[in-house]
C-alpha cells in the first residue's frame, strides 16, 4: 500500500499485489462499478458487526451511482434486507458518522459509531467510549457511514478499503 501510494503521488500506475493485499478491479461504466462494489461488500460480509468497522467504502463524491449517498442507501438495504421505514433514517446496527462537532457531548466531526436504537424522534448511538442520544434537530448531525467521501476518511485507518475511482468523477480525481 505504501509503495502504491508513492507511485500515485508521482503520477505513476499502481502495482497490483498478487497476494491480494492490493488489487485493481476494472469496470466498464458507473453501473458496473456499482455492481462490483456491492458484490465485494457481500463477499466480504459487510453486514457482520465486526466487519462494519474494519471495512470502508470510499468515493470522491456524494452524488451519482457510485457516490456516497447512493452507496449508503444500497448498502443499508443490502445489510438489513429492506428499505428503512417511512419517517425513519436508520436501523439498529447501522454504521453512522457525526457530521459536526458537538463539544457538550464530546462527539466530533468524523466520529463513527453504531445505532443501537432508533425511533422517529430519537437515535441512540454507541461510539467507542460512550453512548449518545440524538433528539430533534441533532439527528441531522448523523449520516450513514458504510460509504464515506475520501475527505471525511482522512485521518482514519481501516483494515480493508474499497476505493472507487471512476472517469465520471474526474473533477475530484487529482493526486
Language model segments and positions:
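C-terminal accessory regions
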Residues: 111-175
Amino acid at each position: 500500500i505504501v509503495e502504491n501510494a508513492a507511485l500515485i503521488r508521482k503520477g505513476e500506475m499502481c502495482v497490483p499485489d498478487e497476494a491480494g493485499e492490493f488489487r485493481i478491479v476494472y469496470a466498464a461504466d458507473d453501473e458496473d462499478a456499482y455492481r462490483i462494489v456491492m458484490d465485494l461488500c457481500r463477499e466480504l460480509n459487510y453486514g457482520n458487526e465486526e466487519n462494519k468497522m474494519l471495512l470502508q467504502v470510499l468515493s470522491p463524491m456524494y452524488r451519482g451511482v457510485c457516490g456516497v449517498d447512493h452507496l449508503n442507501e444500497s448498502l443499508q438495504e443490502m445489510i438489513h434486507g429492506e428499505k428503512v421505514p417511512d419517517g425513519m433514517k436508520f436501523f439498529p446496527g447501522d454504521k453512522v458518522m457525526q457530521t459536526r462537532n458537538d463539544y457538550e457531548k464530546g462527539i466530533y466531526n468524523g466520529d463513527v459509531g453504531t445505532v443501537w436504537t432508533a425511533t422517529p424522534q430519537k437515535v441512540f448511538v454507541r461510539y467507542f467510549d460512550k453512548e449518545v442520544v440524538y433528539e430533534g434537530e441533532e439527528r441531522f448531525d448523523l449520516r450513514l457511514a458504510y460509504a464515506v467521501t475520501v475527505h471525511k476518511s482522512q485521518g482514519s485507518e481501516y483494515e480493508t478499503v474499497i476505493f472507487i475511482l471512476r472517469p465520471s468523477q474526474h473533477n475530484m480525481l487529482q493526486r
